[in-house]
Each structure stands twice: as structure tokens, then as C-alpha cells.
Amino acid sequence: MTLVGKLLNAKPGEAVIRKVDLVYAHDGTMPLIIEAFNRIFNEVRTRAYIFFDHVYPAPTVKVANLHREIREFAKIHGIPVVEGKGISHQLVVELGLAEEAKIIVGGDSHTPTLGALGVFAVGMGATDVAIALGLGKIWLKVPESIAVLLDGSPREYIMASDVMIHLITSLKDREMSYNAIEFFNVPFSFDERLTLTNFSVEANAKTAIIGEEYEGGGYSDEITIELDSLPPMVAKPFSPANGVSVEDVEGTKIDQVFIGSCTNGRFEQIKRAAEILDGEQVNVRTLVAPASINVYRRMIEEGLVRILIDAGVVILPPGCGPCLGRHMGVAGDNEVILSTTNRNFRGRMGSPKAEIYLASPVTAAVSALYGEITNPEGEL
């Protein structure tokens, strides 16, 4: 039986109603959730949290008013609001909110990040999140599961983002809408495991989860990724599924590098970048945003902030930063951005005329030194 099947106690294709252990959302999605909730319910019947991470501090009067509306709703219903402490998915992990949970519903498409903890975590639209808040349960169609087996050991310059750009590209012609991705034999650290599950959404997977020993049985397919031979990967505009070896785009001039987001803003990932930049100077605008205040604090304690500042990096407050193109380093017309985020759709980080390439923090940091996309092999 698949891991998802065990968590939901049902077979693929079945429609089930299950109790929700946690519902959370952020300042970007809460206004629509509030609107839907107020049409149907008057009481929150499950454990819930709200995080201000997408556009915080408020850069406009409109956003400030939306923040006020969210605070008022949260006060009425006794929902904790966490402001400016970091990205929702990271904070759910750090605050221990997913402990002993089986099913988590989030008002963000990257809620499956929490599958690295072994839970069934799924992002939903405003109406479904409102229903989960008001009923404390939700209906689900149990997805099929694809087993992804990681074989071998990654070379020192290979990170989880390389694995995921490769996997997403290999799945681009496959219908994944009601499929889950289950990873096994994962040699990466916990920080990097969160990247695997986070990035799986870009394969159009319903959710993702990480298991320990692969038992087989019940899976719709089995995919093996040979880590020993996997090259550094880059996703070209305008899709995470446009993955190529970094050699294919090496030398592409860039205007800005961004290291951070719910994909790659954790301590280990920023540390990898800082080690590369230590004692050097970046040759292009480079922004780093820690995923949480705890990551930021550890960066200070272990000297990463000094290294990055001395290298010419701009350090942003904990949160989503420029990932969604709302503030803190949006892309201008005809600019080329190299980002460690998970999306590079047209207009994602600002101007629809900008081009966004996706890569790992290692590739991004090396590229920042040269002002062009650079193969990290041979540089480390």
C-alpha cells in the first residue's frame, strides 16, 4: 500500500471525508478565504494558523488594509497570526505544528512541502480551505502514487533542486493531476528533503511525501534517478519543466540572482551559497532571503551574514521576498533573473518581459560571482 493510502486509510480513486488536523494560510490567500468562510460559516472548528509572509511589511495602502482585515478576522475566531517571522511552510515545521498530524490543508499550492514530515499535506483553493476551517474536515479523492527512488550519492555540487528540475522535466508530458510523488532512499538532509516535496507541486502532483524503506506494491509507476551521474540542472523560461544541464545555458548573462524562498531559503542552503561567496565579490545584484527568523538568527550566529554582506549581497527580511513579484527586488523589463525558487512563469517575479531561470543555491552562488550562468563543477 502507498504511503498516501496508509495515511488516508483508503485506496487510490476513492472519495473520502477525513478530519483535518491543521489548516493554515497566508496574507496572499486569506482575503478570499475570509470571503468564502463568511458566506457559509460563523465558527472555526479546527486548529488554524495565519502567516504574514508573502507581502510583508505592507508595501502599499491596499495591502495594509488587507492585513488589517485578516487581523480582525483572526481576532474574532481566535486564530494565531504570525507576522514577519518567515514563510508559512517553514514556520509550520519550526513551530512543531505538524507534529502528530496526519492531514494538513493549506491555503497555498506549496503546502505539500510538509510531506517531508511524513504527513498528507495538500494545498487547496479559498472555498475548500474555508470549508476545512468551518467543518474541521474535508473531502478528498485519494491520488495514485508514483514511487521515485534515489539511487547513489550526489556529487558535492548537486542539490535537491537539481534532482527536482530533472524529475519535473521528465514528467512534463505525463498527466499528474491526481498523482502523488513518494520519495524513497533519500540521501539528503532534512532541509533538502523539504525542497523535494516543495518542488513536486511543479510536476502538477497533488502532494508529495518522503518514506524510508520502499516496500513496493500499489504504485502506478516507479522512477529511479541516478544521483551519481546527475548534472547541475537549470530550468529555462518559462516553465520549471524546461530543465537542461547547466552546460546548455552556461554563459547566459544575468541581471539578478535570488537565493531563498520556501524552496531554498533554509539554513543549509544559504550556508552552501555563503561558503562559495566567502572572501569573494558578486558581479551582479544578489539577494538572499532567509525562510524564517530562526534561519536568519543562525546566519548571524554562525557568521553567514558577515560573509554575505562582505560579498556584496543584499539580505532581505525573512519571507517570500521577490519570488511572487510583488516587492523586494522585482524583475524589470528584459531583465534576466537566476532564482532558486520553484516557478519561472512569464511575469512571475515582476515584468512579463523578464526571463527567469531556476537553479540550485550552489549554481546560483557560483553564477553570481561571474554575472552569468556558470557550471559549479570545477568551481568547488
Swiss-Prot record:
Can the keyword 4Fe-4S be found in this entry's annotation?
yes
Offer one example of a GO biological process linked to this entry: L-leucine biosynthetic process
Co-factor: note: Binds 1 [4Fe-4S] cluster per subunit.
Q: Does the keyword Magnesium apply?
A: no
Alphabetized GO MF terms: 3-isopropylmalate dehydratase activity; 4 iron, 4 sulfur cluster binding; metal ion binding
Recorded E.C. number(s)? Answer: 4.2.1.33
Determine the domain of life of the protein's source.
Answer: Archaea
Q: Which PROSITE patterns match?
A: ACONITASE_1, ACONITASE_2
Q: Which residues bind [4Fe-4S] cluster?
A: C262, C320, C323
Give me the disulphide-bonded residues.
Answer: none
Tell me the protein family, please: Belongs to the aconitase/IPM isomerase family. LeuC type 2 subfamily.
Assembly with partners or alone: Heterodimer of LeuC and LeuD.
| Family matches, as PANTHER family | HOMOACONITASE, MITOCHONDRIAL, HOMOACONITASE, MITOCHONDRIAL-RELATED
Described purpose of this protein according to its UniProt entry: Catalyzes the isomerization between 2-isopropylmalate and 3-isopropylmalate, via the formation of 2-isopropylmaleate.
User: What name has this protein been given in UniProt?
Assistant: 3-isopropylmalate dehydratase large subunit 2
Give the gene that encodes this protein: leuC2
